[in-house]
Amino acid sequence: MDYEALKDQWSEIEDRDGIRLSWNTFPSTRMEASRLVVPIGAIYTPLKERPDAPLLQYEPVTCKQPCRAVLNPYANVDIRARIWICPFCLQRNPLPPHYKDITENTIPPELHPQSTTIEYQLARPAPAPPIFLFVVDTCQEEDGLKAVKDSLVMSLSLLPPNALVGLITFGTMAQVHELGYTECAKSYVFKGSKDYTPKQIQEMLGLLAPGLRAPAPQQQPGRPAPAVAPAARFLLPVQQADFQITNVLEQLQQDPWPVANDRRPLRCTGVALSVAIGLMETSFQNAGGRIMLFTSGPATEGPGLVVGPQLREPIRSHHDIDRDNIKYYKKAVKFYDNLAKRVSHNGHIVDIFIGSLDQVGLLEMKGLVNSTGGHMVLTDAFTSSQFKQSFVRVFDRDANDNLVMGFNAALEVLTTKELKVTGLIGHAVSLNKKSSSVGETECGIGNTCSWKMCGIDPAASYGIYFEIANQGGPAPMQQGPHKAMMQFLTYYQHSSGQYHLRVTTVARPLSSPAGDSALAQSFDQEAAAVLMARIAVFKADVDDGPDVLRWVDRMLIRLCSRFADYRKDDPTSFRLEKNFTLYPQFMFHLRRSQFLQVFNNSPDETTFYRHVLNHEFVGDSLIMIQPTLDSYSLDHEGAQPVLLDSASIQPTHILLLDTFFHILIFHGETMAAWRKAGYQDKEGYDNFRAILEQPKEDAKELIQDRFPLPRFIICDAGGSQARFLLSKLNPSTTHSSGGYGGTQSGQTIFTDDVSLHTFMEHLMKLAVSGTN
């Protein structure tokens, strides 16, 4: 099968099962696997939207303990004997009584060959409706605070009527608003400089009153929780408290504490989050809920502070962190990581929305979001459409009018004896579950076959890594083609109020002892690039930047040495197969990307970029690693994809750059001059008017279903904003190189970075020399 046909097949599988594998044939031995260089891995999107897939309204049929694999199309079913043989552990299991009518021609949906992914609605209802606790920073400009208030009031109409809502505001003090008290506005105030224990918070809020700590009775899904829990004074159903919540929000004022000109406002973000988590964990442990933080500046007081209140003291930079010149960093990270452990244990999600040009301490707080599957939205101001539209998208609904968000999810991976799971890289925490599927080595969050994601959405994707169990030795006699299998079980609380289980079962052939060509052909360079990018980012969080770049280079050289065709020590003979040719290019752009190069980005920005990369599936991750560039000119109709190269900048062209985080329209020199001269408004220049509008229309389409909303930039050649484009282009025309062949075409880029051409020359030289 040629590469294009294979690509189509992999895309089809991705649409159906939400999975892409780095290798689609598995090596037979661990020795062979180590020579592949790129690990066996999968990018899996558990809740990938499949509008055509049925939702089964019964419990799944599972194998005996300890296996617990779910019945799937790869199971051997003996219809006459009413038994099925589990492909994972080979145990025989009886079919349940309600399968008595199945025949060769009438089989249940989960046994259909196309049902490699299937979803069950379980009988277990959620313990409470979804909870939304808003935590709002009042130390901000009047217009910013008003924008947050307006967005929150508007969001009440987007929530299910039975959803519970609460409000905490903070500045110098943190205030928990008692929404259930209707006589007047009433709130409980916590001192911003004090570190409260969970017990103190519960006592102060009256949540430990005798007799009120009994477990809440089970209620019907879709009904509001009975208001017996002590927390019901603070968290009320939207339909019941819409008026009070709107009233409290509209009356919110800026923090009254005076701020001197040479000081930052006193902001107790740490106390506010600690109180929010304490309130939720008392009455709603393991009930789906979101703590949504809206902040416009750094914590300057109390536990978790990231910078002092004096303006002459700058907030930490990457340079300070490298030199260990960090006064508050370690203490703040420890504080927020402890909160993250508590909140992920309780099953609640933390989202952080930022409206600030300055850093707010996202680097220190990242554990709260990354371990709970929350959202990070980084914008310059809450008044921007970027914030407003991103916030609305959190509450998107599906065709059945349910919120497209899952709560309290857990992912378990089962494998056949040939494979072992080594870890997961993504927004989750380990459930420390050991099984025969757990490998000896560790990649990412390892030593477990099960992870907890408090929040999960249709785009949430996870990198899952595997190793081969077989150490080698004489190959056993194999009957027919031999396959290795993996099964992904995702339990989650659906926003309709029931628990669901999504099951994806994957089988791939094992290579024969001499199956080198089959292995090479099965390489999916796009999935591999994303899986390697996740490992590089995981390493970058703990290792030095240069060490990570050396690791990326070393792995690339080894892969090319292993799979390219060449004569030893002859770089001109170097050739890569079609399914490897783009991989070096992806690695070139990855090592130049903001994920690994921190220069020119603040620690908060780096944290945000890495967070989003670890959330998205293959297609969007590749756009982040290697942005797309389209060109528009009067000579061609519509957009023409062009190389991400400085030679693509031409005076008579308009470029549209998509980096996922930014969408940029760049006008070449001549185009910009014509636009400034107003030709588009004159008669007879319809073509020019159309070509100015076309990239804007295409940009609108790109923005349509992206989260968080990208920043939209329109700039001209020579303008300051053009730096966003120039920093992404391959510098084939620099001040020192000139164009190829001595002729200068395209824009000169002032940089010491090597071009892709030079990078490939070095790569070929090292790959053919056999040195790593």
UniProtKB/Swiss-Prot annotation:
UniProt keyword list: Cytoplasm, Cytoplasmic vesicle, Endoplasmic reticulum, ER-Golgi transport, Golgi apparatus, Membrane, Metal-binding, Protein transport, Transport, Zinc
BP GO annotations: COPII-coated vesicle cargo loading; intracellular protein transport
Residues where Zn(2+) binds: C63, C67, C86, C89
Assigned GO CC terms: COPII vesicle coat; endoplasmic reticulum exit site; endoplasmic reticulum membrane; Golgi membrane
Family matches, as Gene3D superfamilies: beta-sandwich domain of Sec23/24, Sec23/Sec24 helical domain, Severin, von Willebrand factor, type A domain, Zn-finger domain of Sec23/24
Annotated membrane topology: Peripheral membrane protein
One Pfam entry name: Sec23_trunk
Top-level taxonomic group: Eukaryota
Subcellular location: Cytoplasm; Cytoplasmic vesicle, COPII-coated vesicle membrane; Endoplasmic reticulum membrane; Golgi apparatus membrane
InterPro entries in UniProt: ADF-H/Gelsolin-like_dom_sf, Gelsolin-like_dom, Gelsolin-like_dom_sf, Sec23, Sec23/24_helical_dom, Sec23/24_helical_dom_sf, Sec23/24_trunk_dom, Sec23_24_beta_S
GO MF, one example: GTPase activator activity
Annotated family: Belongs to the SEC23/SEC24 family. SEC23 subfamily.
Subunit structure: The COPII coat is composed of at least 5 proteins: the SEC23/24 complex, the SEC13/31 complex, and the protein SAR1.
Its biological purpose: Component of the coat protein complex II (COPII) which promotes the formation of transport vesicles from the endoplasmic reticulum (ER). The coat has two main functions, the physical deformation of the endoplasmic reticulum membrane into vesicles and the selection of cargo molecules.
Protein's name according to its UniProt entry: Protein transport protein SEC23
Record organism: Coccidioides immitis (strain RS) (Valley fever fungus)
